[in-house]
Regions:
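Low-acidity, Ser/Thr- and Arg-rich intrinsically disordered low-complexity segments
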Residues: 449, 453, 458-476, 483-513
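Structured catalytic-domain cores with a bias toward divalent-metal coordination
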Residues: 1-449
Length: 513
């Protein structure tokens, strides 16, 4: 196995030359708070069907403000009508109702109530939401910009939304739906338990029941959509989420690759459904982590068999999909030190010498845009084509193990079409409207079994009895890092995984994005 120090020196080699070339070729950006000046730099992407805007962390104000400024420009000047974010659909739908003035809806403490609350309930998002509401007020209802959620984690909330909808439009169908979804009743509060129960033969899979429910809702599209097309779209999407979530929690024990791919496939399918519902010519903007919107084929993730929404968009739309990554060297970030732990404002360590962040940091430029698909920048793309490390901070940040927890190898000019650089960044500001996390009562379904009690701690205690399961999570980490918590990597597991890829450990340990 190669000496890590030799590999590190090889990646770091030539950084000064690359930084010098970037310094002369990149475009200096104003502060994103000056939206009218910042936004026009991104007019070059106005002809795309889909513009995907990334972030290197889930808690950096500069990234949120930059995405807001770019999004405003694309909406106002280039006809984009959909904003889709890495958030749960039911919460985003509440915001969508608010910004499109379509009945009960709000951006308040009821939105985005599950961990990590600060990711979408922060002042930067609130300001954008209020801008979008004001923008929509001035245009016809059928042309108003949508705000949608991409993610797969709203099992309980999506079940509740489907049942509420059917109670209103088809009470008999609601009774059937309750029986079908009753299969998932014991795990509504801790859905990760469901996968374990199926794995150990303690419960039959619920797949047939949730597939039947989705099929019935889709079969009644004409009947239901005549009453309210928007509400039907919402109910159908929630039924899709229940199916995807059932599959996700059932396969999460098989390893991180399969569950990651299912999640990002769901994100892509959601984007497709929203665009199709909007009609021909619809143009969308996606807000998600770099790890989702960059082309996974150009990263260690892809080299290990994973794909993401960015890669799927490139395959589907080609040059009509613009993947824009974001990076920073240092500053502060809103994050937790473990899953379901309180938010902290943490200091972001200066980047490693063998990372892309260090290359851009050596330019000495506070903010810049590097257009990697501009033919005039071919030299820059060639210089950046040597694989280097890239940092990814999710909702969990562990500075003490940053190399293993947050760095992965990538080829940046193949991963992104453009790269937005901030030398120093600051954490998001928790929204003044955010109260304590909502305590939701279990959904009443057709089942005699009580809901599973206990949180992540009891879940970990339950699985630690199985060395095989514990090893899977020790080695891959992703499933629990994403949904419940992160287990420490065992030394033996690290060694085994390192034989597969020198960066397998670093991409898996705390992948909370």
């Amino acid at each position: 196995m190669a000496d890590p120090k030799i590999a590190e020196r090889a990646r770091a080699e030539g950084a000064d030359q690359v930084a010098s070339a970037i310094r002369h070729a990149c475009e200096h950006l104003p502060a994103p708070e000056r939206a009218s000046e910042f936004g026009p730099f991104f007019d070059r992407f106005g002809d795309a069907r889909v513009v995907l805007l990334g972030e290197a962390t889930h808690g950096t104000a500069d990234f949120y403000n930059a995405r807001a400024a770019i999004t405003r420009r694309l909406i106002e000047d280039h006809g984009f009508s959909i904003v889709v974010v890495e958030a749960d659909w039911p919460d985003a739908n509440r915001v969508d109702r608010y910004v499109r003035h379509r009945g009960p809806g709000a951006y308040d403490e009821e939105c985005f109530a599950r961990f990590p609350t600060w990711m979408w309930r922060n002042e930067e998002v609130r300001e954008f939401v209020e801008w979008l509401r004001a923008h929509n007020e001035e245009i016809a209802p059928n042309k108003r910009v949508e705000f949608r959620g991409l993610d797969v984690y709203s099992l309980r909330g999506s079940i509740a939304e489907v049942l509420t909808y059917l109670d209103r439009v088809d009470p008999e169908a609601a009774k059937t739906a309750r029986k079908r979804y009753g299969c998932l009743s014991p795990w509504q509060s801790e859905p990760a338990w469901y996968g374990r129960a199926v794995l150990h033969g303690e419960h039959d899979p619920c797949e047939d029941a949730v597939v039947a429910q989705l099929s019935e809702i889709l079969a009644k599209r004409l009947q239901y959509s005549r009453k309210d097309g928007e509400d039907y779209l919402d109910a159908a999407q929630n039924a899709r989420i229940v199916l995807a979530a059932e599959q996700y929690y059932r396969i999460m024990y098989r390893g991180s690759t399969e569950s990651w791919n299912l999640r990002d496939r769901h994100m892509f399918n959601t984007l497709q459904h929203v665009m199709e519902a909007r009609g021909s010519g619809a143009k969308a903007i996606v807000w998600a982590h770099n790890s989702h919107i960059g082309n996974a084929a150009a990263t260690a993730m892809g080299w290990q068999g994973e794909f993401n929404i960015g890669e799927l968009c490139k395959t589907a739309y080609g040059d009509e999909a613009a993947l824009i990554g974001f990076g920073t060297d240092r500053g502060t970030v809103a994050a937790a030190d473990d899953w379901n732990e309180p938010m902290q404002v943490m200091r972001v360590l200066p980047s490693r010498a063998d990372s892309y962040e260090r290359v851009f940091g050596q330019t000495g430029i506070a903010r810049s845009l590097t257009d990697l698909r501009d033919p005039r920048q071919s030299e820059i793309s060639e210089l950046l084509a040597k694989p280097r490390l890239e940092r990814a901070i999710g909702v969990v940040y562990r500075p003490d193990t940053e190399f293993y927890s947050h760095y992965f190898e990538a080829v940046l000019p193949e991963q992104f079409d453009a790269y937005v650089w901030f030398e120093e960044t600051r954490a998001v500001t928790r929204s003044r409207r955010c109260g304590r996390m909502a305590c939701r009562r279990p959904i009443r379904l057709a089942s005699d079994r009580p809901p599973v009690r206990g949180g992540a701690t009891s879940f970990i205690a339950a699985i630690q009895g199985s060395s095989e399961t514990s090893f899977k999570y020790s080695a891959s980490g992703q499933a629990l890092a994403v949904r419940v918590c992160t287990l420490p990597i065992e030394p033996s597991a690290s060694a085994n995984l390192a034989r597969l890829s020198p960066f397998a450990v670093s991409t898996k340990e705390t992948r909370s994005f």
